[in-house]
A protein has these predicted regions:
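Short secondary-structure subsegments characteristic of cysteine-rich extracellular domains
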Residues: 66-74
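Low-complexity, intrinsically disordered short segments enriched for Gly/Pro and polybasic residues
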Residues: 1-2, 210
Length: 274
């Protein structure tokens, strides 16, 4: 596993350090930040969004707080005013609203700077931004669009739908409101092969919104609020649920990420990926 950082808007130099548990990774990352000029995007007095994923309550799979604390210290040393931020989830979970999101952040150890839910109490704070590609526009979370600079901290991992999730997905899904998330997910469709469906209702039981309907021992997904997440598809015991136009999700992620980037002036975003 590696940690790397890059500065700039879309594609500039990328710097790597080895993920070696026998080394002091804070000292190693210090040298990386200097080489990459990670914090050169910050000017004195800037309100700096520190975009991260605080993890689910009780789940340890997130960037550890001591790495984030180090980044917060570097931002303050550069004259910035950092705030931790992430957008509320579309699905019903512990991070579905700002109150529970903040509680989760605190319980998981993210208390070194104020935490602001990027899209407001119930995802009502957003801005429509023009973009390019498969999406003509995207709903960007208000606190992201209003920040002066941003450090994007991403935990890179595999993903059922997009294949891989890193900085682009962190921008695209993590910096957009619920409406923006739905815009991206709805570029794909779900299809149920009725010859394989047994009506077992596993899809309904695992769906965060309990959306699939079981009619005459067959499942149907017709709700307009279905966000085309991969949960039901991955849990179906007979593999009856399939995605159509699955390649569109990566195109939508790229469009949304570009829309987020364009709310900032040039060279006001840096990225640190784990």
């Amino acid at each position: 596993m590696i940690l790397y950082s890059l500065i700039g808007d879309i594609s500039l130099s990328v710097y790597f350090i080895p993920w070696d548990v026998n080394q002091n990774l804070l000292l190693e990352s210090e040298r990386l930040y200097e080489k990459a000029e990670t914090f050169s995007c910050i000017e004195k007095g800037d309100l700096v969004a520190v975009k991260l994923h605080v993890g689910e309550l009780g789940n340890p799979s997130y960037v550890q707080p001591f790495f984030v604390h180090h980044i917060i210290q570097k931002i303050r040393a550069a004259g910035g005013k950092p705030f931790l931020t992430d957008s509320n989830t579309y699905y019903l979970a512990q991070r579905h609203n700002a109150y529970d999101h903040i509680q989760t952040a605190l319980m998981n150890g993210f208390n070194m700077a104020p935490f602001i839910a990027a899209d407001g109490l119930r995802s009502e704070n957003s801005r429509i931004v023009k973009t390019r590609g498969i999406l003509p526009e995207i709903s960007v979370s208000g606190a992201i669009a209003e920040a002066d600079a941003m450090i994007v901290i991403s935990h890179c991992k595999g993903h059922d739908l997009s294949g891989f999730g890193g900085a682009i997905k962190n921008l695209a899904m993590g910096c957009t409101s619920r409406a923006g998330k739905l815009q991206q997910h709805r570029v794909v469709n779900l299809e149920i092969d009725q010859t394989k469906c047994t009506g077992c209702a596993t899809c309904k039981s695992v769906c965060p919104n309990n959306l699939p309907e079981i009619v005459n021992k067959k499942a149907y997904i017709t709700s307009p609020i279905c966000m085309r997440c991969p949960i039901c598809q991955s849990e179906c015991p007979t593999k009856a649920i399939n995605f159509l136009n699955k390649e569109n999700i990566c195109k939508a992620l790229a469009s949304a990420a570009l829309g987020v980037i364009e709310t900032f002036q040039k060279n006001k975003i840096s990225y640190v990926n784990f």
